[in-house]
Swiss-Prot record:
It is an enzyme of class 3 (hydrolase). One of its GO terms (molecular function) is methylthioadenosine nucleosidase activity. Its EC number is 3.2.2.9. GO terms for cellular component: cytosol. SUPFAM superfamilies: Purine and uridine phosphorylases. GO terms for biological process: L-methionine salvage from methylthioadenosine; L-methionine salvage from S-adenosylmethionine; nucleoside catabolic process. The active site is at E12 (proton acceptor), D198 (proton donor). It comes from the Bacteria. The gene is mtnN. This is 5'-methylthioadenosine/S-adenosylhomocysteine nucleosidase. Pathway: Amino-acid biosynthesis; L-methionine biosynthesis via salvage pathway; S-methyl-5-thio-alpha-D-ribose 1-phosphate from S-methyl-5'-thioadenosine (hydrolase route): step 1/2.
Length: 230
């Protein structure tokens, strides 16, 4: 099995890259691709850059040039569930956009025109992730909705609107639904796994800066364990 792994930031891919066996490197379209072996699997590790457009470009290039059997998005997120803490994990069962609004044309809030309202994650990948979490037993883990948008959610009004629009949302980040949309269009199974670097409404900028490496490490450890079971 060939696995594509996408992280937006250096802190989200550094540990994974350090564990790869002599990866070959390709820089293309502002993205970096590292191809090699990790946990016994052929892996293409991708540093996409931040945001929906960067994630879409990276995912499209990854799928077109390397043809992985599945894609896993790793990294950090901001927690929205009241009982989540920094370092806790969220496994997405589906991804939605929180900053898309074409409801004037009869679409759901968050639904892009001519696209589904949500991009479901692959059930088999979810099950593998849950097994790994159960074995680790280190962090609280939830499975549910993660939403994506091109904004860092630190303003009270934006947080309140997101909660009202998506009351079931567990976490928010800036790439996952874009990756999900591209995988949907290419018909490739995918999964988003995120560790919490900050919690909505709780000194988020300072928290993110302090804990992004911790969140990246937790998420990377989870991915390595998953690879051993795929």
């Amino acid at each position: 099995m060939k696995v594509g792994i996408i992280g937006a930031m250096e802190q989200e891919v550094a540990l994974l890259r350090s564990q790869m066996n002599e990866p070959t490197t390709l820089q293309l379209g502002g993205c970096e691709f590292y191809q090699g072996k990790l946990a016994g699997k052929e892996v293409i590790l991708t540093r996409s850059g931040i945001g929906k457009v960067a994630a879409s470009v990276a995912t499209s290039l990854l799928l077109e040039k390397f043809a992985p059997d599945c894609v896993i998005n790793t990294g950090s997120a901001g927690g929205f569930a009241q009982d989540l803490h920094i370092g806790d994990m969220v496994i997405a069962d589906e991804m939605r956009f929180h900053d898309v609004d074409v409801t004037a044309f009869g679409y759901e809030m968050g639904q892009m025109a001519q696209q589904p309202a949500a991009f479901p994650c692959d059930g088999k990948l979810i099950a593998v992730a849950q097994d790994c979490i159960a074995e680790q037993g280190k962090h609280q883990t939830k499975v549910g909705l993660i939403c994506t948008g091109d904004q860092f959610m630190c303003k009270p009004d934006a947080i309140a609107k997101a909660r009202a629009d998506f009351p079931q949302m567990l976490a928010v980040e800036m790439e996952g639904a874009a990756i999900g949309q591209v995988c949907h269009m290419f018909k490739v199974p995918y999964l988003v796994v995120r560790a919490m670097s900050d919690i909505a409404g709780k000194e988020q900028v300072e928290s993110f800066d302090a804990f992004i490496e911790v969140a990246g490490q937790h998420s990377a450890e989870m991915i390595i364990k998953m690879l051993g079971k795929l």
